[in-house]
């Protein structure tokens, strides 16, 4: 198990140590081979090929049972720019329209027959070509796979989404997910023999259609069941493409349309996108308040005891009485402003707020999610949104530090960036003549004296993250 985990993480040294302790056991050999093949070191790659040759030489009759090892080495060859592409794709009996078919692989016919009909082998080939940077040929392999009649799985669809994001066509990635997961695709009948690859230009990938419906003798409709990992790949690609509003719309449709349950990574991407959309929007933002309300609803639904948490700024102590008095005064001001606004507007707002009304998942929120939520709350203090006022800004300021009480109650240790954010904002908005000792004493009691950021650390963080606000 340790060798397999090390192989997944790409830790060649740990995988080698496990392999040596197990004295070359069959399971450890495959894990060690994967660790070597996924390494970026040329020496590790040469060792992987030597180990693979030894495995196939010592047990040639069992080569058909080593299909996963063949797939691992196929991916390694596809990602190695020193090996010509036409030699790599020939293992799956593919050739480009302008290339002659090449057969450089010494592979048993039974193994090649299994690889040709394996969706995992085609996906590994696409991933390797993407690692090489050859997006066009990677698309050609995916197109040839469905033209051959090999039904893709969710992992293959995830790789196709990555392909479109790398090519700069995020809309096509979204269309493919809806096409394969919502409507379904009728694949052609399985075919054997060599398949010709259609390799378009990268800029033309947004208009290229795959060869799936041209054959009249079609099989059943293939409809994939999306997973949370596929959804997170789509959300991450939209975030990197700066399509934040589209990301929020997709996130809102995960459960009702795709029937995908969000996880911690999904919520983290939603908070980051809502903050980025609020920063970039030229009009009052709507998704950021909705994301904030959703997160609070999710947190209090999973942990009702958090509603009893008190603000750390109201911690008892003689040096904190100014801050406590200021908080009480602001609460009275918010109450009065709310009453006057309802009387003036007739209890109706001009713009109804955007809400995220999807069912609440049960997730384990970590320190990074809380940090991005704190950044979202801080952003809402500085941007315009429907219903924004001085009273709501003061309320957000209190909530920013209430996050610390929530994390303490849930036994979640904050990131260093979160501590700097709290201390910096605390010092910025501190009332005149108020002391900073009360807040820092509360942090020291919770995390220890060493956790309180120094003035030099706060200055460096402020110059990197907050200087642009002024």
Language-model region placement:
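A basic, Ser/Thr-enriched alpha-helical scaffold prevalent
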Residues: 1-470
């Amino acid at each position: 198990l340790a060798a397999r985990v090390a192989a997944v993480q790409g830790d060649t040294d740990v995988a080698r140590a496990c392999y040596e302790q197990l004295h070359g056991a069959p399971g450890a050999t495959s894990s060690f081979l994967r660790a070597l093949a996924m390494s970026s070191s040329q020496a590790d790659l040469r060792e992987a090929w030597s180990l693979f040759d030894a495995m196939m030489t010592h047990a040639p009759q069992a080569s058909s049972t080593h299909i996963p090892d063949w797939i691992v080495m196929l991916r390694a060859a596809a990602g190695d720019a020193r090996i010509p592409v036409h030699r790599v794709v020939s293992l799956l009996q593919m050739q480009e329209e302008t290339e002659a078919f090449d057969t450089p692989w010494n592979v048993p016919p039974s193994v090649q027959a299994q690889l040709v009909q394996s969706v995992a082998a085609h996906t590994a080939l696409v991933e390797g070509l993407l690692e090489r940077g050859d997006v066009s040929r990677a698309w050609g392999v995916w197109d040839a796979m469905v033209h051959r009649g090999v039904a893709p799985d969710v992992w293959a669809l995830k790789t196709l989404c990555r392909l479109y994001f790398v090519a700069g066509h995020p809309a096509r990635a979204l269309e493919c997910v809806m096409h394969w997961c919502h409507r379904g695709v009728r694949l052609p009948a399985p075919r054997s023999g060599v398949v010709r690859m259609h390799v378009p230009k990268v800029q033309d990938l947004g208009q290229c259609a795959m060869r799936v419906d041209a054959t009249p003798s079609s099989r059943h409709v293939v409809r994939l069941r999306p997973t949370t990992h596929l959804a997170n790949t789509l959300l991450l690609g939209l975030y990197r493409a700066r399509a934040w509003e589209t990301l929020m719309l997709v996130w809102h449709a995960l459960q009702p349309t795709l029937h995908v349950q969000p996880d911690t990574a999904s919520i983290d991407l939603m908070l980051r996108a809502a903050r980025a959309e609020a920063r970039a929007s030229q009009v009052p933002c709507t998704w950021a308040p909705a994301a904030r309300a959703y997160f609070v609803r999710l947190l209090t639904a999973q942990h009702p005891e958090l509603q009893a948490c008190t603000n750390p700024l109201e911690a008892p102590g003689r040096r904190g009485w100014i801050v406590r008095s200021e908080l009480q005064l602001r609460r009275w001001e918010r109450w009065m402003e709310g009453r006057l606004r309802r009387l003036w507007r007739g209890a109706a707002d001009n713009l109804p707020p955007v809400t995220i009304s999807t069912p609440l998942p049960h997730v384990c929120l970590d320190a990074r999610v809380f940090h991005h939520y704190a950044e979202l709350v801080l952003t809402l203090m500085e941007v315009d949104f429907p219903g924004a006022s001085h009273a709501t800004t003061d309320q957000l300021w209190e909530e920013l530090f209430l996050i610390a009480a929530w994390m303490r109650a849930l036994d979640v240790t904050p990131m260093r960036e979160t501590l700097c954010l709290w201390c910096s904002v605390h010092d910025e908005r501190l009332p005149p003549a108020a002391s900073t000792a009360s807040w820092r004493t509360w942090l020291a009691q919770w995390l220890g004296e060493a956790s309180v950021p120094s003035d030099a650390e706060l200055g460096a963080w402020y110059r990197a993250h907050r200087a642009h606000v002024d």
